UniProtKB/Swiss-Prot annotation:
<dbReference type="InterPro" id="IPR045867">
    <property type="entry name" value="DNA-dir_RpoC_beta_prime"/>
</dbReference>
<dbReference type="GO" id="GO:0005739">
    <property type="term" value="C:mitochondrion"/>
</dbReference>
<dbReference type="InterPro" id="IPR000722">
    <property type="entry name" value="RNA_pol_asu"/>
</dbReference>
<dbReference type="GO" id="GO:0009536">
    <property type="term" value="C:plastid"/>
</dbReference>
<keyword id="KW-0934">Plastid</keyword>
<dbReference type="InterPro" id="IPR042102">
    <property type="entry name" value="RNA_pol_Rpb1_3_sf"/>
</dbReference>
<keyword id="KW-0479">Metal-binding</keyword>
<feature type="binding site">
    <location>
        <position position="69"/>
    </location>
    <ligand>
        <name>Zn(2+)</name>
    </ligand>
</feature>
<keyword id="KW-0804">Transcription</keyword>
<keyword id="KW-0808">Transferase</keyword>
<dbReference type="InterPro" id="IPR044893">
    <property type="entry name" value="RNA_pol_Rpb1_clamp_domain"/>
</dbReference>
<dbReference type="GO" id="GO:0006351">
    <property type="term" value="P:DNA-templated transcription"/>
</dbReference>
<keyword id="KW-0548">Nucleotidyltransferase</keyword>
<dbReference type="Pfam" id="PF00623">
    <property type="entry name" value="RNA_pol_Rpb1_2"/>
</dbReference>
<feature type="binding site">
    <location>
        <position position="493"/>
    </location>
    <ligand>
        <name>Mg(2+)</name>
    </ligand>
</feature>
<feature type="binding site">
    <location>
        <position position="489"/>
    </location>
    <ligand>
        <name>Mg(2+)</name>
    </ligand>
</feature>
<dbReference type="GO" id="GO:0000287">
    <property type="term" value="F:magnesium ion binding"/>
</dbReference>
């Protein structure tokens, strides 16, 4: 369909029987209306031509050859009969054969049939609107239950067999013959409703606005009751409240879209255009046909049998009619969803029939296989790798991809800045990779966001906007914090990059889709930009430190200090004394690391500000060291206290590693930057 802005779009939903007829019906010059498929046949076995009123009828779906009717006549441009749209003899319209890709037909069902998607889907829309258990509705649809009409003053479900066997067993000998009389048909049509027709009657009687009002009142009453303390009753109340919310949402959707609930029960079954369910003839008289054709044949045969029985309802037993209605319902269910009744339907070769649901859904379905995932203009694709130097809102684009995406913008700026005189020379400069090209490319990229997408796009965080930067190589660089939103990792995953062209698209990308604007999960509200995988491993390695504790023994079994390093050269272990150094600031520690005096996991003592909480601790020191001048050191598990002769604390050192120091500095800088940004906004 095409909306008011001339955008092509696809919409899936319920339609009225009148709309289905409007899609298919055509009026011939003689006044005959064609569009209904009444025969299960496809092609004549002798002439290989489509059968009239069959699944491939040319009168209904259009000619097989463009502007050539079933008789073989053609309408050439400039001919005398150019104004005649239809052949006078066979009734085929003189149009292009491509009409068989979108011209639909329909099957007029002899009895109403429920749409299996709306009956057995989770949640069941029909069960939600009627506020009935799904099992009872299924029993009603498939003839296991019957529904007493309001005229009988018993609008409840009842099992006829149980009713007659238990309550009226004494009158069984006189009631049984009544079922075979013509009067029972009149009684059944007046007093009893069964099958999908009963569902349709109940849906047609619904007032959606009353459902909204009653459900809202009931939900408020349950909310006011609160918790009773009984776990079972509270659970039932919660389930009921969730059901009422779903029911209100469904009723509101039907009202907003102007859809009638009874449209969930089919009276007319649309028939797909023949080009979407083809029959292919191969060499050796082999015929390959779509499974949908076989399923349509089954529906038409069973529907014709039911129509025949209904015409002779005086002679046909009621049980036989109900059984045939059930067969029609099952045939339509198999056409729409072959696995809806449990085990999928199979053909004579034990092969599972591929229904309409199977054709549409899944990775090999019509949408994901044919319509989605195609290449589009101004897009590229490459493997993603980690970009540790990138900001959260940045991504690294390879030079090759960037110059292709922004080529038109670069050409425009080259001509605007009079670096070239025409497009041909500008393309040559780009091909030769002149320095001015890269300068202009960086200038263009600075103000133009790009979109990164990783398939499958299961939620809105599957496509986000980034500020591109040029990187060497042929891979896209990505900040590791945004991987969770894409469900991506760096083991060979690929991502597509798209270029928003219009100003509206660029504004939407900047305001709504930038990665630093999507820090929380839209589903549950939890943070989604959290360290994962590579970042967790890096943080673990950075902060693990040396596992040697401060309480290690002075000497090991070999008579060596535990603080000594072991060098294994020529299988002769040698030990060198490794003293834990004291540093007055983190800058001194980083300088020692750059001079390769310490390692990332080397334990060290870092001077810390005097903290009264530490001083006031009543922890017993592990060791106290006294020096000749009267100063002393109290060594604790995680810190060291230096005091003078007067027992005054001069300084405190904490035991840490360079990895902890680096991690702390990064967090401190991030917090300070956030505080400054927040103060600016205020």
């Amino acid at each position: 369909m095409i909306d008011q802005y001339k955008h092509q779009q696809l919409q899936i939903g319920l339609v009225s029987p009148q709309q289905i007829k409007a899609w298919a019906n055509k009026t011939l010059p003689n006044g005959e209306v064609v569009g209904e498929v009444t025969r299960p046949s496809t092609f004549h076995y002798k002439t290989d031509k489509p059968e009239k009123d069959g699944l491939f009828c040319e009168r209904i779906f259009g000619p097989i050859k463009s502007r050539i009717c079933a008789c073989g006549n053609s309408r050439a441009s400039g001919a005398e009969n150019e104004d005649e749209r239809f052949c006078q003899k066979c009734g085929v319209e003189f149009v292009d054969s491509r009409i068989r890709r979108y011209q639909m037909g329909y099957i007029k069902l002899a009895c109403p049939v429920t749409h299996v998607w709306y009956l057995k889907g989770l949640p069941s829309y029909i069960a939600n609107l009627l506020d009935k258990p799904l099992k009872k509705l299924e029993g009603l649809v498939y003839g296991d239950f019957s529904f007493a009409r309001p005229s009988a003053k018993k609008p409840t479900f009842l099992r006829l067999r149980g009713l007659f066997e238990d309550e009226i067993s004494s009158c069984n000998h006189s009631i049984s013959p009544f079922f075979s009389t013509p009067g029972f048909t009149t009684f059944r049509n007046r007093e009893i409703a069964t099958g999908a027709g009963a569902i349709r009657e109940q849906l047609a009687d619904l007032d959606l606005r009353i459902i909204l009002e009653n459900s809202s009142v009931e939900w408020k009453e349950l909310e006011d009751e609160g918790y009773s303390g009984d776990e079972w009753e509270d659970r039932k109340r919660r389930i009921r409240k969730v059901f009422l919310i779903r029911r209100m949402q469904l009723a509101k959707h039907f009202i907003q879209t102007n859809v009638e609930p009874e449209w969930m029960v089919l009276c007319l079954l649309p028939v797909l255009p023949p080009e979407l369910r083809p029959i292919v003839y191969r060499s050796g008289d082999k015929v390959v046909t779509s499974d949908i054709n076989e399923l349509y044949k089954r529906v038409i045969r069973r529907n014709n049998n039911l129509a025949y029985l209904l015409k002779r309802s005086e002679l046909a037993p009621a049980d036989l009619v109900m059984c045939q209605e059930k067969l029609v319902q099952e045939a339509v269910d198999t056409l729409l969803d072959s696995g809806s009744r449990g085990q999928p339907t199979r053909d004579g070769h034990n092969k599972v029939y591929k229904s309409l649901s199977d054709v549409i859904e899944g990775k090999e379905g019509r949408f994901r296989e044919t319509l989605l995932g195609k290449r589009v203009d101004y897009s590229g694709r490459s493997v993603i790798v980690v970009g540790p130097s990138l900001s959260l809102h940045q991504c690294g684009l390879p030079l090759e991809i960037a110059i292709k995406l922004f080529q038109l913008f670069v050409i425009r700026d080259l001509i605007t800045k009079r670096a070239t005189s025409n497009v041909r020379i500008a393309k040559r400069k780009i091909w030769e990779k002149e320095p001015i090209v890269w300068e202009i490319l960086q200038e263009v990229m600075r103000g133009h966001p790009v979109l990164l997408n990783r398939a499958p796009t299961l939620h809105r965080l599957g496509i986000q906007a980034f500020q591109p930067t040029l990187v060497e190589g042929r891979t896209i660089c990505l900040h590791p914090l945004v991987c969770k939103g894409f469900n991506a990792d760096f083991d060979g995953d690929q991502m597509a990059v798209h270029l928003p062209l219009s100003l509206e698209a660029q504004a939407e990308a900047r305001l709504l889709m930038f990665s630093h604007m999507n820090l929380l999960s839209p589903a549950i509200g939890d943070p989604i930009c959290v360290p994962t995988q590579d970042m967790l491993i890096g943080l673990y390695v950075l902060t693990i430190g040396n596992r040697r504790g401060i309480c290690a023994n002075r000497y090991n079994s070999c008579g060596n200090y535990p603080n000594q390093k072991v060098n294994y050269n020529n299988n002769n272990p040698k030990y060198t004394k490794d003293k834990e150094s004291l540093f007055s600031s983190s800058y001194d520690a980083l300088g020692a690391y750059r001079q390769k005096q310490i390692c990332l996991d080397s334990p060290l003592w870092l001077r810390w500000k005097l903290d009264q909480r530490v001083i006031g601790l009543r922890e017993v020191p592990i060791e106290v060291q006294y020096e000749s001048l009267g100063t002393y050191r109290e060594i604790y598990a995680h810190y060291l206290v230096v005091g003078n002769r007067k027992k005054e604390i001069r300084s405190i050192y904490i035991r840490t590693t360079l990895g902890h120091i680096s991690f702390y500095r990064e967090i401190e800088e991030a917090i300070q930057g956030f505080s400054q940004a927040y103060s600016y906004t205020i």
